[in-house]
Amino acid sequence: MTDTDPNFRFEGTFFETLGIRIVEATRERVIADMAVRPELMTIGGRLHGGALMSLADSIGAYGAFLALPQGAAGTTTIESKTNFFAGAAAGEVRGEATPLHIGGRTSVWQTRVTQKGKLVSLTTQTQMVLMPSPPRPERA
């Protein structure tokens, strides 16, 4: 990976551990693929719900990061809800995160995860905008 590859910034992170690969990333949409590997599956042979939620949270948070207002220090998830519609078998899933709201203090993102065009899960998450802490006064 190079620093022009959008996946470069995720080297050595949970994002990389999950095997998430960014396909497209703008403040209006983030698309990513994730391989459904044995270590992410349940004993029933389907992608674990926690892995689905982690994919959705990761790419929704990245979209929120890209949409941060000027001067913001970062973003963090403050609420997340996921509905599961189908199991995902071995292969690959695709997540597409889009904003429902982008404000000065929060943003709300919705992520659809599909496999071969079939809806697997739908996550809605709220991201809080983190502002830099004011400098602390020095003690005498």
PLM ranges: what are they?
Residues 1-140:
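Terminal targeting signals and extreme-terminal segments of soluble enzymes
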